[in-house]
Amino acid sequence: GGGIIKSNNTLYEEEIGSITGMVLELGPDCYADKKRFPSGPFCKKGDWILMRSYSGTRFKVHGKEFRLINDDSVEAVVEDPRGIAKL
């Protein structure tokens, strides 16, 4: 039988590849490109989303991490982030 062998580095990168976050605010130009987002906004304020771990600009305010990400960095909207498991 055939198969794919992945290096430890590849496995590690896949493991840390996605994280969840809550949408705190949407900027005025978010999802404004009708060609890329013909159905309108993909997510809304208060949604839990899945994004790549390297997405956006990371910063801390009073010890809490925040990120500024582009609208096209949202991979999915998830109901409950506690149910998300990394493979």
Predicted regions and their residues:
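Compact, glycine-rich, soluble single-domain proteins
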Residues: 1-87
